[in-house]
Amino acid sequence: MERTEVLKPRTLADLIRVLHQLFAGEEINVEEVQAVMEAYESNPAEWAVYAKFDQYRYTRNLVDQGNGKFNLMILCWGEGHGSSIHDHTDSHCFLKMLQGNLKETLFAWPDKKSNEMIKKSERILRENQCAYINDSIGLHRVENISHTEPAVSLHLYSPPFDTCHAFDQRTGHKNKVIMTFHSKFGIKTPFTTSGSLENN
């Protein structure tokens, strides 16, 4: 059947083409998108042009704008880099490991009181694994806990967003954060000093 071929993108360009097909309609089939992203086997020769690292923080590098339906980006995590605890602004978030490992820690939404946030689970995501989260599942923090190996991950957000909330683990208090891109389509963007969710 033609459908099974669609689920096996052979290249990053092929994956992007299939994603455009999957997001052409109004409804999103989460399982299908996740299966397609997981089926793509990471090939550094295809994505290295987008993988722009920063010495001090993880970076967000835009790969494709998905006709306004989604943003596809590559995140580059140096040794020890991590995000804060954050939400996803009512968007679908798919994460696929391209290189290395990342630790994902899931948190419950904080209550109105000023209390330490409750950790729900944690896991290690390994090369070619895919994960999914949305705000109904909870909040998460993503970190490269290796001190010797960088990590690279492919993220799809639908619908795209440019602000989200970062949370203080000790109090549950949140701050609005404007998200920026370190590079777009393989070209470094100016003024990227703000707007990542790094741990402070």
UniProtKB/Swiss-Prot annotation:
Signal peptide start-end: none
Post-translational modification: The thioether cross-link between Cys-93 and Tyr-157 plays a structural role through stabilizing the Fe(2+) ion, and prevents the production of highly damaging free hydroxyl radicals by holding the oxygen radical via hydroxyl hydrogen.
Pathway: Organosulfur biosynthesis; taurine biosynthesis; hypotaurine from L-cysteine: step 1/2
One annotated Gene Ontology cellular component of this protein: cytosol
One Gene Ontology molecular-function label: ferrous iron binding
GO BP field: L-cysteine catabolic process; taurine biosynthetic process
Domain of life: Eukaryota
Residues the entry annotates as binding Fe cation: H86, H88, H140
Substrates-to-products reaction catalysed: L-cysteine + O2 = 3-sulfino-L-alanine + H(+)
Numbered residues of crosslink 3'-(S-cysteinyl)-tyrosine (Cys-Tyr): C93-Y157
InterPro entries found in the cross-reference section: CDO_1, RmlC-like_jellyroll, RmlC_Cupin_sf
CC cofactor note: Binds 1 Fe cation per subunit. Ni(2+) and Zn(2+) can be used to a lesser extent.
Function noted in UniProt: Catalyzes the oxidation of cysteine to cysteine sulfinic acid with addition of molecular dioxygen.
Family, similarity comment: Belongs to the cysteine dioxygenase family.
Subunit-level organization: Monomer.
PANTHER family: CYSTEINE DIOXYGENASE, CYSTEINE DIOXYGENASE TYPE 1
Protein name: Cysteine dioxygenase type 1
